[in-house]
């Protein structure tokens, strides 16, 4: 028996200012899939990920998400301004009592959840966004440029976590490494 896909895009087309971003795009994401979208800046990778996340409506085509599928989206530059600390941001989507998941990820990522958002560096903000996504443990992870602003130690942690996860994931990069 064939497995139901977590997410399916069928005939997706999108234009910006009359210019096609993509046309008649089809994509099927199955449980456990690992997909990398690699391309030059401005080629539509982040826009496609927003369509996958359900945050951008295509001009044409269908986005189908299997009912009950948890999707986590790590955007390229999340707005943390509504939060006092990095830990507040990282735990915001978790049910009460599940905050320990952020602490576990924070330990691996070597970031301090009590760090005020106002004084956090780009790398610290990125680590908080990763901790949030990993703490959510969704069935499908959408990661837009997850290694931006990270040092080698954090990148190696991310690689190990992604290598061990059972979640499917789509990762965007403009770096072929």
Residue ranges of model-derived segments:
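ABC ATP-binding cassette signature C-motif
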Residues: 1-177
